[in-house]
Structure formats: structure tokens, C-alpha cells
Amino acid sequence: MRYLTAGESHGPSLTAIIEGIPAGLTLHPADIDHELQRRQGGYGRGARMSIETDRVQISSGVRHGKTTGAPITLTVINKDHQKWLDVMAVGDIEETLKLKRRVKHPRPGHADLVGGIKYHFNDLRDALERSSARETTMRVAVGAVAKRILAELGIDMLHHILIFGGITITIPSKLSFRELQERALHSELSIVNPKQEEEIKTYIDKIKKEGDTIGGIIETIVQGVPAGLGSYVQWDKKLDAKLAQAVLSINAFKGVEFGVGFDMGFQKGSQVMDEITWTPTQGYGRQTNHLGGFEGGMTTGQPIVVKGVMKPIPTLYKPLMSVDIDSHEPYKATVERSDPTALPAAGVIMENVVATVLAKEILETFSSTTMSELQKAFSDYRAYVKQF
């Protein structure tokens, strides 16, 4: 399985092409639209999300509600493009129109300046448009297809926010996977403690009035993955490493950890390692899951627990100082439409990129020309792991 995305933030559309999806997977536009709508939700989103109502168009690889095994083409139209016809025109336009929305005061923390240096851009909009988080629309769309595969194999997932702009979420003890999932899904903030909703919303409103932004830490949990996915034989076959790369590829993500993560640096080996158990009904298990479901780059059969840290969004309505790329004089940075926070949306994106990596690993590991073939191979493997 592989995919490519294309498109700019204010261009006519966004596109993804996915190759390697088995034939026979039940797939409807509504499956993808559901994830796209989740990405657009959450408290703190800005004006752009009131303009766009993301809906996918599937133009290849699916017929009568089933995948055919051919490449799948997904497209999402940018409604906002109608206001940017001159600025984002494909053909050449008058010089005065080219200057209309030219970006020459790069934003600290964004790809504007370095992208312009790398690709020799006189107008930093050429970097801004592609590096925008709008691109993640298609990664969520691809992830929605991946999640359909995982669901057919008995794998489920959730995300929730652990730290919201410096506020630590108090997680009630002994919540099951399903309880965590339900609480997060029914929260505008993707948190599992409803008692903290108003405190955080008030804080977001305050940050917005100040023209500032906030980040946080998101946790994704995956349940139902058997032991043995990934490999230790080469560095690039380690599944946790693949997941780390995928999470860090999300716009504004600056760190990743598994299980208790960096806290391991403060603990002893006897406190961190997950003791092994075995029962006739369940096979192998663990007393704990401090390592987040991975040993040696391979899944252990415990829930996968991965955390990502998102920096505050770089675009500030009270901009920081920058430099004019023509005169090299100090100037306030460019202001584009932005949000005080996008943590709930980032959680949906993270969940979907994790799903994509896991689906890809499964498709590469098991016979998967068709879904029925994959389901049998996966079921047989589960049985093997249980009796090992």
C-alpha cells in the first residue's frame, strides 16, 4: 500500500491516490466523510472551517460499494478557492495581480522562509500553500480507508488529549477502552474528563482574544493488534519507528513517545519492563503496558499507545517580528487565517495516520489481494499466536 497527496490550501481541490488496497473492501464516501467531518470539528477552530464542508469524491478504484483492487482516487473540493482565483491561477496573470497576496514577511515557526530559500521562491506563498495543514485533509481521507481495513480485522482505535495548552487532563481511573473512546468522541475538546471542558474553553477564548495560540499532547490507543507486526532484523522495518515518522510528519508535531515514554528516563528497568503472563484462554499477555505495545520494533499484542506533542500554531494574529525578504528590514510576520488551537483536529489526523501505517504493515505482511484472503490469513495468524 502506498499513497500520494496533492493540492494547495487555496487551490481548486485536494487529491490522494492510494494503491494496494485489496479488492472486496466495502467502502462508501460516507465512511471517508465521517472522518473528514471529525477533522473539521472541535472547539477553537477558525473561519476556514465555517467555509469548507469537506466531502470526498471517489473517482476510481471503487464500484458498487466495493474496492476493485485498482488505485483509488480521492478528491476534496476547496470551496474557498473561488475567492482566490487570481492568486492561485495556474496560467500566467498580470504582474499587479501576482502581487495581490504576495507573502514576503515569513512567519516564525512555519515553512515560509526555509521553503522559499530551498525552492528559490520570490513569493513565499508557494511554500505556504503546500505546507499548510490543509494538506492533512487527504491524509485523513486515506486514513479513513485504512480504518475500514482495520475494522474488518477487529482492530479499533481512539485518541484523546492529555495536555491542553498547559492544562493537564485528569483521567478517571479504570476507564475501559470503550469508555475512553465514547468520552473522547462526545467531547468538543477530545478530552475524557467532562468536568474540565469549561475551564479549557474559557482558556481557549482568552488565548484567541490575546491573538495567541496553544499546543498540547495527544494520545492515540490502538486495540486488537496481535503480537509480531514489524521486525527487528533491519532498522527501517521497526514498526514503532514507522509510526514515529508518520506522527512527526503531521504539521506542527515536534515529539513522539510510546507507553510511558520519556518518563522511562527516571525509572529503573524493574519498574519499566512489562512482565509476561500466559493463560489457556488468552495465550500470552502482560502485567503492564509501560512500553506502549512494542518490544524490538514489534507489537507485543498489548494496546499500542503512542503520544505526540503539537506545538502552538505558528500563525499569530498578534504577529512576531520577521524580516522583509526584499529589503531585509524588520517587519511584522504575515498574518494568514488561523485558529487559537487545532488540537482536537490534530488528534483526528494523528489517529488516521497511525491507522494508515498499521494497515500498510498488515497488507505487506499478509496475503491481501482480496479482503477475504486477508481476513483468513489474519485470522489464522491470530490463532497461531494464541497457541504458540
Swiss-Prot record:
Its cofactor is FMNH2. FMN binds at R130, S131, S132, N251, A252, G296, K311, P312, I313, P314, T315, R337. GO terms for molecular function: chorismate synthase activity; FMN binding. Its EC number is 4.2.3.5. It is an enzyme of class 4 (lyase). NADP(+) binds at R39, R45. Pathway: Metabolic intermediate biosynthesis; chorismate biosynthesis; chorismate from D-erythrose 4-phosphate and phosphoenolpyruvate: step 7/7. Keywords: Amino-acid biosynthesis, Aromatic amino acid biosynthesis, FAD, Flavoprotein, FMN, Lyase, NADP. One of its GO terms (cellular component) is cytosol. One of its GO terms (biological process) is chorismate biosynthetic process. Reduced FMN (FMNH(2)). It catalyses: 5-O-(1-carboxyvinyl)-3-phosphoshikimate = chorismate + phosphate. InterPro entries: Chorismate_synth, Chorismate_synth_AroC_sf, Chorismate_synthase_CS. Signal peptide: none annotated. Gene3D superfamilies: Chorismate synthase AroC. The keyword Ligase does not apply. Pfam families: Chorismate_synt. Belongs to the chorismate synthase family. HAMAP family: Chorismate_synth. Homotetramer. This reaction introduces a second double bond into the aromatic ring system. This is Chorismate synthase.
